[in-house]
Regions:
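Conserved alpha-helix/loop element of class I SAM-dependent methyltransferases that forms part
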Residues: 24-53
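Residues lining the SAM
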Residues: 123-125, 154
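Class I SAM-dependent methyltransferase SAM/SAH-binding core
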Residues: 54-110
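A short acidic, Gly/Pro-enriched loop at the edge of an enzyme's catalytic core
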Residues: 112-121
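Conserved class I S-adenosyl-L-methionine
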Residues: 150-189
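N-terminal, positively charged/glycine-rich alpha-helical extensions of SAM-dependent methyltransferases
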Residues: 1-26
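A short glycine-rich, Lys/Arg-flanked "PGG" loop and its adjoining helix->strand segment in the class I
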Residues: 135-150
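Short alpha-helix
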Residues: 199-206
Length: 206
């Protein structure tokens, strides 16, 4: 599993550099720097009032959403395993005039690395598919929350995630549960934002 994590880290380090340029506008970084809220409508609606709440953003990547939480009044910490992503996150915070704490590490290290406890853990879009054990993930989150603290999770339904589009039809392709010792391997030349940059580290494991 360590090998899979390192393979993924190299891929996400490279993606972070590409995403920091945001050539396609997929991450809305220019709009975010200009003061706009870059959260999706579903998150913005469901989160409610978070002013003054201590929030831990898990797998925060380049920190855009972490900073959106700060803009909404939260005291936010972003946690991610990619050093390149966090370099971008800190730079984006400086550019935006927003204060957030960014910590490099894995979720199971959160209680040791982050300044908890927290009122809310926040995790959205394409996160849990990368995790080898959701029980460990849940225990790590519980360990950093105050009594009565909450987890906000927004992601695609697992029933959708097992599908692939083939000949304009969605077909079941993957097992609903992937064995930890046999992660799925994928290879993509480019990242998901539409930027045409060809990546060196193209392989990921989920």
């Amino acid at each position: 599993m360590t090998d899979a994590i390192e393979i993924n880290r190299r891929n996400w380090d490279e993606r972070a550099i590409i995403h920091s340029r945001d050539t396609t506008g997929d991450y809305m970084l220019d709009r975010m720097r200009a003061g706009e809220d870059a959260l999706h409508a579903i998150e913005a609606t469901e989160l409610g009032e978070i002013g003054g709440k201590r929030v831990l953003h898990l797998q925060c990547h380049i920190g855009r959403d972490t900073l959106c939480l700060v803009r909404r009044g939260a005291i936010a910490t972003g946690l991610d395993f990619s050093g390149e992503a966090l370099r971008t996150a800190r730079h984006l915070a400086q550019e935006s005039g927003l204060k957030a704490n960014f910590v490099q590490g894995r979720i199971e290290e959160a209680s040791r690395l982050t300044p908890g406890p927290f009122d809310l853990a926040f995790s959205t879009w394409g996160t849990i598919c990368w995790l080898p054990d959701l029980r460990v993930w849940a225990q790590a989150i519980a360990a950093v929350l105050v009594p009565g603290g909450e987890l906000y999770l927004a992601d695609a339904h697992p029933g959708f995630q097992v599908m692939e589009l083939r000949d304009d039809r969605l077909e079941p392709t993957y097992d609903f549960q992937t064995p930890v010792e046999r992660p799925l391997e994928f290879s993509d030349e480019t990242t998901y934002t539409g930027d045409p940059t060809i990546m060196t580290h193209q392989t990921t494991r989920e």
